[in-house]
């Protein structure tokens, strides 16, 4: 499951836990971007600013369980509802973990083939 789902599951069931193998995993990052061909850049900036507003960021974090980039929200959550929940607190200290990169053309092609197959089913 995704870490946000795991955070929710763990908060509802103390018998569940989140495990990161010592062999490593991928370091995950969520991001908002504005594409170069975006026709509504001002609106996109307004949306990003809205999502980074402390109240909105807290509400979003409480709803989806994902770690917030807003420091005050993160600190509120790790000392509150998600205190001690390992799926909420990212572990970037494991030297065996890595950032997955999918830039190779053969990988992009494979994703395109799989996506086409999924859409066809």
What spans do the regions from the language model cover?
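Mature extracytoplasmic/periplasmic domains
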Residues: 26, 35-95
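Ligand-binding pocket segment of bilobal, Venus flytrap-like solute-binding proteins
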Residues: 1-21
